[in-house]
């Protein structure tokens, strides 16, 4: 019994299919590529461009008809699937209708991603949120729901706002710690209320420290120009007008409070001023001698203005100031020798005793 596939609309055959059409023999054999025979004798093509055909022993030995599986099949035949879509094959259901599957999926069924708009807070909402953030940075679910009901937002929006606010707060705190200067940690007022141990820069006195010589510096500055012009720097330091002749306390002294340190500085300043005047009075007389005798008994009470006014007066006859610096250098050298004759140790001891007495008074 000869069984053939139903006639379908003819399609253009490929080169491979044309070559296969001449390869039939008369021995009831089927020459095809990628073909499978079912139990009922029908053929299934594996590719849309393959040629499928059935053969059976014809009584006249004629070549069986060749049919190409194109866009589909009808009746009992199952043909190659879809011509252009590239999807599944066309399956016949035996009623003359074919059911096919589309190769391309439908993307319209997928739900589109919902776009969330940026939440805009009103000033009243921000004030309420900031007030609650000041209370706690980590509100629980109940507190967030309560806040959401008050401000008219959802709980998720309130939670996101607190997360962003915490991140901003942490970033600001980190930036503040990085750029904070050491001076910002000190108190605003200058002096401490009670004496406290200070740094070495306040307690140690050095020979080149000019903080204890404000009046002497002013005296040197307000000297007459003709006196400072011809006076060498080392001779000025021998007279006591420079910082090199400061009656410095040894650095090995114990640390004291800031108030005691200032008192010692004032004592040293007063003693340095008195000593400098004593040195100048040894080579002068007249107004300089009277001014020295007036200020010599007391250690305090000396002002820079009075000293500068006294020193700015014309020089006495016994200390002539001429264009040549020889006479002035000799007189200053003699004063320096007399300065060396005084006991620096005794002056230091007197300063310490005076500072101790002042400390006892203020205690």
Swiss-Prot record:
Motif OAR, chain ranges: 342-355
Molecular functions per Gene Ontology: DNA binding; DNA-binding transcription factor activity, RNA polymerase II-specific
DNA-binding positions: 114-173
Keywords, comma-separated and alphabetical: Developmental protein, DNA-binding, Homeobox, Nucleus, Transcription, Transcription regulation
Compartments where located: Nucleus
Compositional bias segments (type: Low complexity): 300-313
Keyword Hydrolase attributed: no
Coiled-coil stretches noted in the UniProt entry, renumbered to this chain: none
Biased composition annotated in UniProt, kind: Gly residues: 69-97
Region (Disordered): 48-119, 300-328
Domain of life: Eukaryota
SMART domains in alphabetical order: HOX (SM00389)
BP terms from Gene Ontology: neuron differentiation
Database matches in InterPro entries: HD, Homeobox_CS, Homeodomain-like_sf, HTH_motif, OAR_dom, OTP_Homeobox
Keyword GTP-binding: no
CDD domains: homeodomain (cd00086)
Gene3D superfamilies per UniProt: Homeodomain-like (1.10.10.60)
GO cellular component: nucleus
Assigned protein family: Belongs to the paired homeobox family. Bicoid subfamily.
Function summary: Involved in larval skeletal patterning.
Protein name: Homeobox protein orthopedia
Gene name as annotated: Otp
